[in-house]
Every structure is written in C-alpha cells, then in structure tokens.
Amino acid sequence: MSETLYTGISQLATPRPGPQRGAAMGDLHIIEDAALLVRGGVIQWVGPRAAAPTATHVHDLGGRAVVPGLVDPHTHAVWAGDRLSDWEAKLQGATYEEILARGGGIRSTMRATAAADVAELVALARPRLASLRASGATTTEVKSGYGLDFDAELRMLRAVRELQAEFELRPTLLIHVPPQEGRAEYVVGVCAELIPQVAREGLAEALDVFCEKEAFSVEETRTMFAAAQAHGLRVKLHADQFHAIGGTELACEVGALSVDHLEASGAAQIAALAASETVATILPGVTLHLGLPAAPGRQLIDSGAIVAIGTDLNPGSSPLFSTQLALALAVRLCLLTPAEALSACTVNAAYALGLSDRGSLSAGQRADFLVLNGQDWREVAYTLGGNAVAEVYLAGAQL
C-alpha cells in the first residue's frame, strides 16, 4: 500500500473532525512547519515536521499552506439553456413576474433541461464541476429539480451518476417547482412513483424539497419527507428564502440533514436550528447575484447552530462557479470569520451531506486536501477573483 509523507507545509490549518458549532467553529488546529502522512488514501498522522515518522515516499510541498478539501453541499450543476436574458431584464427593472410572462424564469430552464438527453446534460455539467473542483471542492452535492416531468428528473440524476466518480458527487432528488395544474396528484406521484424508482436505482442519497409560499407547503413537504425516509433516503430542505413558513421547524423536527438558504430566518428559526443536529447551510452567492438580504450567518453561529456554506450554483440566482469564492463571500456578506468559514466549508458541509470521513486533516480521515499558492491558510478566505488553490489532492492523489 502506497505511503507518502508530505513535508514543506508552511502552515496546516484544519477544524477538528465532526460537526462544529458555536465557538468551536473558529477554533482551528493550526500547525506551523507541518507534515502529513498518507497511506492508502487515508491520513495516518499529522503534526510538526520535526516529529514526523519515516515513510516510503516523501513529497515536499514547497513551503506552502495546506487546508482540507472543500465540500460544496448545495449545487444545481446539471441544467441546459441559460438565463442571460432574464438577468439583463432584471437589471433593467423587470419584475420576476414580468420575466415569467415573457417565457423566462425557472420554467425556461426546465423546458431546456427537459429537452436535453443524458449525454447532453453530462457534457454541459462537466466543465461546471471542473470549475468547482479547481476552486478546491473535493466533494460536491448535485441536485435534480429542473425536470418538467418525472422522466426529466430521472435523466438529470442519471447524468449526475455518469459524473459521480469523476467529481466525487453526492446526488440529491429535488422537488422544486409545483406543477401549474394537478398539484395534489403531483405530490402523490412523487411519493408513489418517483421516490420509489429513485431509491430502487440508487440515483440519490437524499430528497430535497423547496418549502416556500410560492412552492410546496409544510404539509406537502412533510408527506414527501415521510415517503423518502420510508425508502431509505435522507431529507433536506430549501427553506426561509423569502418567507419563514415553518419549513425550518419541520426539518429540525424530522432530523433533516440540512436547511438551506435561511435569508428570511428569524429568532424562532435560528433557535430551532441551534437546538438541533440539522445543519444551517448559507448560500452567499444568492445574496451577491440577486441583491437580497444575506442569511444571518453571524447570529446562527453565535446561537450555537451548525453552519455550512454552499455555492447554490444555478443559472437563475447564483451563477457561482467557485466554492472557494462562496467561502470568501460568507466572510464579507454573512459576517463569518475566516476560521469559521473554513469549518463551514469543510467538516460542517460534509456533515450536511451525512459524511463523517472527510473535512478535517486528522488521522483516519480521507486525505482530501488543498495546497495553496501562499504560506498563510487565510489566503483561501481573503482572495477574490483569483484562485488561492495551487494543487488539489483527492484521497492522497493529486488531481
């Protein structure tokens, strides 16, 4: 079994293993002049170079900083078409209702995606995922949700499966937009047909629902959650993006992996998350692109919630192709410290996907790590527009 000791690490910065909350999110383990021993894709030892064990191979990283690989827990990286006209119309003052009336908005993405076959969707998604990987994402969640019908949803998930090994993807079935007619029948179909088929084919690890005034109600969400859990899927939620209607409280009640968005969360929702094991995932790219209020990241951490960060990469509200930039934006827009943001983008984001084997540079963890261009780990949160990441390692192998 291959064994490599990585030396020449000016500074190694990592959160402890497992979900971090409150003050622990900012309490990184930082080692100056560090070394890292990897065997069989798993970290065996981390510590000062002067105390390092011997190894078959030694690899000098050239005096640069090392941090864990980033985990992106929320993307919509599979879609067809574009929303450039929508974006320009919005800049000129058009309302979303006006954009919809012109044939734009999310339904234009759904039409284009429904018209694409699996091979086309794979070809479109691959460069997007490559951009996330280059920014430091070693594990990435990808949702369906742009299907006009169940067949289109399944094609999206099959496209994710084609790319799964290449990009270490975690697939999620997203129930995103209610049909314009036959809403009750649609929910029944999701529970009786779509979820069972997805579970049979192993196409997703979790079910996500958009719970919002303009989308699915709390009771509809509860029904779909129950069906998903009965078929062995974990559950997660889009909630509190525009209105707090009870979705966050439901997610905490049923033990959801995460609640994502949270821009409209108030004291009750923050308290519910703080008292739960459900992760609060904030998506600062939406704040930047749409000019909406930011999720209350500072308040969530101060209350004791487990906070993660995602890009929400999608064509309509967050064309953000860098997980690293999402981390940096969370510092500026959601008022996290650099250390908190690193924890949010690593161990906490992994926990939001139900993963405990990555996100920390500790013995027993997967050897997913980033070598930065500079000597100080804070470059990963400081840099805007450039790429602080020089090299990406997945299970100990440089990509």
UniProtKB/Swiss-Prot annotation:
N-formimidoyl-L-glutamate binds at Y146, N314, G316. It catalyses: 4-imidazolone-5-propanoate + H2O = N-formimidoyl-L-glutamate. The keyword Cytoplasm applies. Fe(3+) binds at H74, H76, H238, D312. The gene is hutI. It is found in: Cytoplasm. It comes from Deinococcus radiodurans (strain ATCC 13939 / DSM 20539 / JCM 16871 / CCUG 27074 / LMG 4051 / NBRC 15346 / NCIMB 9279 / VKM B-1422 / R1). Residues 1-13 have a biased composition (Polar residues). This is Imidazolonepropionase. Keywords: Cytoplasm, Histidine metabolism, Hydrolase, Iron, Metal-binding, Zinc. Zn(2+) binds at H74, H76, H238, D312. Its EC number is 3.5.2.7. Catalyzes the hydrolytic cleavage of the carbon-nitrogen bond in imidazolone-5-propanoate to yield N-formimidoyl-L-glutamate. It is the third step in the universal histidine degradation pathway. Its cofactor is Zn(2+); Fe(3+).
